[in-house]
Amino acid sequence: MADMAKFEEEISKLKTLEKDREKYFSSRQEMEMRLTESKNVKAELDLMDSDSKVYKLMGPVLVRQDLEEARSTVEKRLEFIESEIKRVEASITDVNKKSIEQRDKVMNMQKAFQMMATQAQQQAAQKK
């Protein structure tokens, strides 16, 4: 019975890793959307003349912002998002590796249980 408890614990670890992977994929997808949006904003700002007026939404109010400041802010946001994507991708790689290892561990335990069950059946058949 202790073996079965250990098996269930290992399955639980695998499920946790799979949930983590889903969370990281979702996070990466969200960051990709932010990256695309920020690239579009940067492209729009790059098309503007130096005397163009730029407004920034702060709560319910539009506030005038310097064009160079807006470009700088968007550039920093792009750098931040790209670094976050790299961090999440590293986490995805790590959790994928751990998931594969955990899946192998669970499969090996399952095979061992099946072999024990087969041996028990064979021994029971021999006793008859």
Curated annotation (Swiss-Prot):
InterPro entries: PFD_beta-like, Prefoldin. It comes from the Eukaryota. One of its GO terms (molecular function) is protein-folding chaperone binding. Gene3D superfamilies: 1.10.287.370. The keyword Cytoplasm applies. Keywords: Chaperone, Cytoplasm. One of its GO terms (cellular component) is cytoplasm. One of its GO terms (biological process) is chaperone-mediated protein complex assembly. It is found in: Cytoplasm. Binds specifically to cytosolic chaperonin (c-CPN) and transfers target proteins to it. Binds to nascent polypeptide chain and promotes folding in an environment in which there are many competing pathways for nonnative proteins. Required for positioning of the mitotic spindle. Heterohexamer of two PFD-alpha type and four PFD-beta type subunits. Belongs to the prefoldin subunit beta family. This is Probable prefoldin subunit 6.
